[in-house]
Swiss-Prot record:
Gene3D superfamilies: Mur ligase, C-terminal domain, Mur-like, catalytic domain, NAD(P)-binding Rossmann-like Domain. The keyword Ribonucleoprotein does not apply. GO terms for molecular function: ATP binding; UDP-N-acetylmuramoylalanine-D-glutamate ligase activity. It comes from Chromohalobacter salexigens (strain ATCC BAA-138 / DSM 3043 / CIP 106854 / NCIMB 13768 / 1H11). ATP binds at G118, S119, N120, A121, K122, S123, T124. Its EC number is 6.3.2.9. PANTHER family: UDP-N-ACETYLMURAMOYLALANINE--D-GLUTAMATE LIGASE. Keywords: ATP-binding, Cell cycle, Cell division, Cell shape, Cell wall biogenesis/degradation, Cytoplasm, Ligase, Nucleotide-binding, Peptidoglycan synthesis. InterPro entries: Mur-like_cat_sf, Mur_ligase_C, Mur_ligase_C_dom_sf, Mur_ligase_cen, MurD. Cell wall formation. Catalyzes the addition of glutamate to the nucleotide precursor UDP-N-acetylmuramoyl-L-alanine (UMA). It is an enzyme of class 6 (ligase). One of its GO terms (biological process) is cell wall organization. This is UDP-N-acetylmuramoylalanine--D-glutamate ligase. It is found in: Cytoplasm. The lineage of its organism: Bacteria, Pseudomonadati, Pseudomonadota, Gammaproteobacteria, Oceanospirillales.
Length: 455
């Protein structure tokens, strides 16, 4: 049986974050070895070339003796309850401690951390806050679950005055303590139940973002985001009228304005990102930025010009009076509900929803009510198309097709002037695409080639 040498760190997982962990340990001159549950992980030969002399063990973790490891550091894609790890997780002190990349980051970081989690909108708020900080003149590093891994940011931005980090539940569940200057929990809806078991387990992982936090930003309309045991100042945001101290939307001079309490900040109409869900994102970023001491004028300038991120409610084209919107990042039911709510109030005609893929065990029934109100039809495809059809067909017309290309062809056939075709799948993409970006690009290319490109 292969064995981890004494005083060596064991890195498990050769994904993007796992390789960042390895680079970090190499820079520090700390001895380590690597394991991956896959027999032939992608990028293995390139990793060996970059780290000569580092042992790599592939295959079941039960076949590896980890008892003498200094520490076990997991890539976020590795479930802590994987056989071979679970005993160390369930019985702390029985062997090496099991942590994730963020534990290593926190040990090294000497600048303030702004951390963002939630089932949806993490990337938008992370990017938005990073732009606000830069506009305010701060040296800012942005990454984590978005873009550059957190550990690489330490090397790439050694003079950063602020780290703005998107953090997933997978990252947080292996983070014993974070100590963020401001931490936001944006929303919670069903996702990753195949990893966390149930909503209680999923929420518990997200709640770790508040460990050691000096300030919390939470959703006034979603009590699941509120800290279980607040140990810091808490600021709430809402897209309704705010209470004293909250961020929200008020009527001011005949217009709707973003506001803190009753103090109007800027007209909603000047926020470039459209939709109620994006107004919530703007308010969350403002609340975090205000706590950090960012310039209010700078934050408003960013909101006036920031268009949002690709594949997140992204307007692609209007053709024959029909608008086509790419929300491929809508990989869970909550994200799709937010997209429908954001678009529904501005519809001239009806909505045509394209949904499907790997539902990760989610309940699709919450989609039925808003679709019954707004939609002409739902067109479903992919692995969980049948489950989507069963959840929706009692409330609105549903057509099941094989793939995204067939769904788009059907949408073009039934759409009328004034309608909006929305790709917001409520599912992961991996049954038919490498990732949600590839799915969104297929949507874009199909439109660019007038249906000639394959999806």
């Amino acid at each position: 049986m292969p064995r981890v040498p004494a005083a060596h760190t064991l890195v498990i997982g050769l994904g993007v974050s796992g390789q960042a962990i390895a680079r970090h340990l190499s820079r520090r001159g700390e001895p380590f070895m690597v394991a991956d549950t896959r027999e032939s992980p992608a990028g293995l030969e390139a990793f060996r070339a970059a780290h000569p002399g580092v042992d790599v063990v592939c295959g079941p973790l039960e076949a590896l003796d980890m008892q003498e490891a200094r520490e076990i550091v997991l890539s976020p894609g590795v479930d802590p309850r994987t056989p071979g790890l679970i005993d160390y997780v369930d019985h702390p002190g029985s062997g090496p401690e099991v942590v994730g990349e963020m534990a290593l980051f926190v040990r090294e970081c000497r600048s303030p951390i702004a951390a963002i989690t939630g089932s949806n909108a993490k990337s938008t708020v992370t990017t938005l806050l990073g732009e606000m900080a830069r506009e305010s003149g701060w040296k800012t590093a942005v990454g984590g679950n978005l873009g550059t891994p957190a550990l690489d940011l330490l090397d790439e931005s050694p003079d950063a005055e602020l780290f703005v980090l998107e953090l997933s539940s997978f990252q947080l569940e292996t983070t014993p303590w974070l100590g963020a200057d401001t931490a936001a929990f944006l929303n919670l809806s069903e996702d990753h139940l195949d990893r966390h078991g149930d909503m209680q387990g999923y929420r518990a992982a997200k709640q770790r973002i508040f460990r050691g936090a000096r300030h919390a930003v939470v959703n006034a309309e979603d009590p699941a985001t509120w800290p279980d045991a607040p140990s810091c100042a808490v600021t709430r945001f809402t897209t309704d009228m705010p209470e004293s101290g909250e961020w929200g939307i008020v009527d001011h001079d005949g217009e709707r304005w973003l506001a803190q309490g009753r103090a109007a900040i800027m007209p909603v109409g000047q926020v470039r990102m459209p939709g109620r869900h994006n107004h919530a994102n703007a308010l969350a970023a403002l609340a975090m930025g205000a706590h950090l001491g960012l310039s209010r004028e700078a934050m408003c300038r960013v909101l006036e010009r920031f268009p949002g991120l690709p594949h997140r409610g992204e307007f692609i084209v209007e053709r024959e009076g029909v608008r086509w919107i790419n929300d491929s990042k809508g990989t869970n039911v909550g994200a799709t509900l937010a997209a429908i709510a954001g678009i529904g109030s501005d519809l001239e005609g009806r909505l045509i929803l394209l949904a499907g893929g790997d539902g990760k065990g989610a309940d699709f029934s919450p989609l039925a009510e808003p679709l019954a109100h707004h939609a002409r039809e739902a067109i479903v495809f992919g692995r969980d198309a049948e489950r989507l059809e069963q959840a929706l067909s009692a409330r609105l017309p549903v057509t099941r097709v094989a793939d995204l290309a067939a769904a788009m062809q059907r949408a073009r056939t039934i759409a009328r002037a004034g309608d909006t075709v929305l790709l917001s799948p409520a599912c992961a993409s991996l049954d038919q695409f490498p990732n949600y970006m590839a799915r969104g690009e297929a949507f874009r290319q199909w439109l660019a080639t007038d249906g000639e490109a394959a999806c």
